Amino acid sequence: MEQLAQSGIGLALAAFALTVVATRRVLGYLRQKQIMDLPNERSSHSLPTPRGGGLATTPVLALALLVQADFRFLGIGALALLAISWIDDRKGLPPGPRFAAHGVAVLGLLLLLPGDALVFQGVLPLWADRVLALLGWLWFVNLYNFMDGIDGITGVETLSLGLGIALVGGGTLTAPALVVAAVAAAFLVFNWHPAKLFLGDSGSVPFGYVLGGLLVMLA
């Protein structure tokens, strides 16, 4: 257990440093290309602010998951969602293709769960357990997408949940949960009020997906 915690802390520190470096580069690119989040009634910013920080956070998060055998498919799913979400950030996508991509990524992970790994602890039959887990996970992903655009909120929520999962879950969940928290903390350097950068769909959707997956595994 102690060795798992130590390796998780080391991986998290590396992820924090890499995210800070990558985010600085991405921020310059977004400013150059004028990829901006325009203020609306939900916004806490009054000026156009670069959007697309997920180009930095998601690859670091996915890489840290890919080097852990138990979480490789979660990392692959995060990269797939980065690709579709970046298109949405740049050009906009209708809800159908976006939700379909989210559904495929979530369903793929649920199908990999062993039949005796019941998310709702056996209260429901297997088919109902998986359907409810699918709907809950999709809701969670889209909740994260909705939160983006408000200074600091997504980063603080992600940091808190990551640390909470690491403390409560322990074991093999420690390292990925600490990495999630570390990447979120690094992003907060740029997203704290007044925000210099927002995640965009390319960051908020994969964050919600990965955290949702860890919560399912915790259950």
Q: What are the roles of these predicted feature ranges?
A:
Residues M1-A219:
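"…together with the soluble PPM/PP2C metallo-phosphatase catalytic core" -> "…together
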